[in-house]
């Protein structure tokens, strides 16, 4: 297990003290003044990669800030821990596991050693099985129980087994199959699966069930509902093998369900759920895009992996993104982070990154199990930017909390409609400028005077129209949302998460907060049956809520 017990807390590092003092000095500065003082600011605080331009110049930082943040990364041994992760060491200490989702997209020919075994043959074997199945389904050669080809794929999973494939297939829909429709079910509510199944033909549907243990409550509840719906039409348990495949490690339960051995895809415990779309969990991606599209996604991520490993810290996009985030969170005290894609293709990206960031770094103790005295992950939230402008941007511009934002846009749209993309991107560029510059009272007075508003009326409303600005943002400009670029974008954020977890000295690759809720839900579910005894062990609120629910549903 990688040694995480003897470490220096971030607050005890010299650079932390330097940054704390420096933040107090900079809090009286305005970002627009920093631009006025330095014509080369953009080039100093941006990184151009083949697939992503990362501009962080609209943050309240100077060259002194950058130097101190880089010192923090050095003193935190980010480079050493990066090497440990890529070498397959057990940096997931609470579960005693390697963290090797990066191995799934490694396009070199080098051995991938994990726990003394070269994982490359197993990875390549699963990729080959994904290729064969996806090509067979997409070509129409995969036949259902009545001899018809597949027209619809229903992916059943939750968390990382759902969010990743859903986000990617939505983002790359323009490149996907027009004859194979993709559907996703995650919610145990029942409404979602009922909506998905309505109108589908049992003779032409393929279900992909993704559950590492094949016991995940939400996933298996939906899987059993799908099975019942299918069997009502097929009336032959043997037909399940032609309409269900699984991604799981529990072969015994999967085969008992009726899924053929050759249609069970493997997972590994060194791949966390929220980082698993690169594995067979990404089978829906291969089915939608075709296997070559899935390989392009892996290629884009691999290119970012190489950049993360090889680029100097000061020109390393994941490192600088992580450091700017820590500066905003821990030294300027900003409580949240907005993700604002200005590309409809990326409309599921904020939800995907919510899980990736908050499930990874939403922790309250350090490696030694001690409560931390500093903030960990901020609240991550967002929406497609142009919709957000007419919803919550009012708060971003004039609210009492300053919320840093990542603006993500593309130079070329995946679907071109005359005039639309330039109109979209005009808003994209304008919003980051407006958040940074703001508008002061004198400017407001001049504008209102020019419109003929009376002096008395101006004084009544001037303060309501003032925007203080000084609201930080990052801009990520992509050439186009395609598979390689999306792979690079996802990997950029993955490595940002890793770097921040190392600096915060928290375990980024477990999720015990998720596990607690599962345990309690399993205990409560039997109590909801009519006639079941009440459990006096619950707190008064939970006990009475359960009683009210049971009484009302009789």
Model-derived features: positions:
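Extended, charge-enriched "interface" segments that sit outside catalytic cores
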Residues: 7-146, 423-425, 429-456, 500, ...
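Gly-rich Lys/Arg/Thr-decorated short loops/hinges at beta-loop-alpha junctions or inter-strand turns
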Residues: 106-119, 173-180, 371-373
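Glycine-rich phosphate-binding loops that contact phosphosugars or nucleotide phosphates
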Residues: 132-140, 146-311, 523
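Short glycine-rich or small-residue beta-strand-to-loop segments that form or flank ligand, phosphate
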Residues: 151-157, 207-213, 336-343, 379-380, ...
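Short, solvent-exposed amphipathic alpha-helical segments in soluble enzyme
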Residues: 168-173, 198-202, 223-225, 261-262, ...
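Active-site phosphate/pyrophosphate-binding segments
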Residues: 229-418, 425, 438, 469, ...
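Substrate-recognition/cap regions that form aromatic- and gly/pro-loop-enriched pockets
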Residues: 397, 409-487, 491, 497
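C-terminal helical/tail subdomains of lipid-metabolizing enzymes
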Residues: 474-531, 538-553
């Amino acid at each position: 297990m990688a040694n995480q017990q003897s470490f220096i807390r971030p607050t005890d590092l010299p650079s932390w003290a330097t940054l704390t003092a420096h933040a107090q000095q900079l809090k009286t500065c305005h970002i627009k003044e920093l631009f006025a003082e330095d014509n080369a600011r953009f080039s100093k605080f941006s990184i151009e990669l083949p697939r992503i331009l990362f501009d962080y110049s609209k943050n309240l930082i100077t060259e002194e800030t950058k130097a101190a943040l880089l010192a923090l990364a050095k003193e935190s041994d980010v480079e050493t821990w990066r090497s440990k992760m890529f070498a397959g060491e057990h940096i997931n200490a609470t579960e005693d596991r390697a963290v090797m989702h990066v191995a799934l997209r490694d396009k070199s020919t080098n051995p991938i050693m994990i726990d003394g075994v070269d994982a490359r043959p197993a990875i390549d074997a699963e990729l080959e099985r994904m290729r064969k199945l996806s090509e067979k389904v997409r070509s129409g050669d995969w036949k259902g129980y009545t001899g018809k080809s597949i027209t619809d794929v229903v992916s059943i999973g939750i968390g990382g087994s759902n969010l990743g494939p859903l986000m990617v297939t939505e983002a790359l829909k323009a490149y996907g199959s027009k004859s194979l429709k993709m559907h996703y079910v995650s919610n145990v509510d029942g409404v979602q699966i009922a909506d998905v199944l309505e109108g589908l033909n049992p003779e032409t549907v393929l279900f992909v069930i993704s559950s590492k243990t094949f016991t995940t409550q939400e996933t298996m509840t939906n899987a059993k509902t799908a099975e019942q719906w299918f069997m009502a039409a097929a009336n032959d348990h043997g037909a399940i093998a032609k309409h269900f495949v699984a991604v799981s490690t529990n072969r015994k339960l999967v085969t008992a369900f009726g899924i053929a051995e050759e249609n069970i895809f493997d997972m590994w415990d060194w791949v966390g759920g929220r980082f698993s779309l690169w594995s067979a969990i990404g089978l829906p991606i291969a089915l939608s895009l075709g296997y070559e599209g899935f390989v392009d996604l892996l290629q884009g991520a691999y290119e970012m992996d190489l950049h993360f490993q090889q680029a100097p810290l000061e020109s390393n996009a994941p490192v600088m993104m992580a450091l700017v985030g820590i500066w905003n969170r821990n030294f300027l005290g900003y409580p949240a982070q907005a993700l604002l894609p200005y590309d409809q293709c990326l409309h599921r990206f904020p939800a995907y990154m919510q899980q990736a960031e908050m499930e990874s770094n939403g922790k309250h103790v350090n490696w030694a199990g001690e409560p931390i005295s500093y903030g960990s992950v901020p609240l991550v939230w967002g929406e497609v930017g142009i919709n957000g402008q007419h919803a919550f941007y009012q708060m971003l511009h004039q609210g009492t909390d300053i919320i840093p934002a990542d603006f993500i846009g593309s130079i070329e749209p995946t679907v071109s409609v005359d005039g639309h993309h330039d109109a979209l991107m005009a808003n994209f560029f304008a919003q980051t400028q407006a958040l940074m510059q703001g508008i002061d009272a004198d400017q407001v007075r001049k504008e209102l005077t020019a419109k003929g508003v009376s002096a008395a009326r101006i004084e009544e409303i001037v303060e309501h129209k003032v925007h203080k600005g000084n609201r930080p943002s990052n801009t990520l400009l992509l050439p186009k949302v395609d598979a390689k670029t999306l792979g690079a974008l996802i990997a950029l954020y993955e490595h940002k998460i890793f770097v921040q977890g190392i600096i915060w000295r928290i375990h980024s690759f477990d999720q015990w907060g998720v596990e607690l809720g599962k345990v309690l839900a399993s205990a409560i579910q039997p109590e909801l049956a009519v006639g079941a005894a009440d459990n006096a062990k619950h707190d008064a609120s939970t006990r009475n809520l359960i009683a009210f629910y049971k009484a009302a549903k009789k």
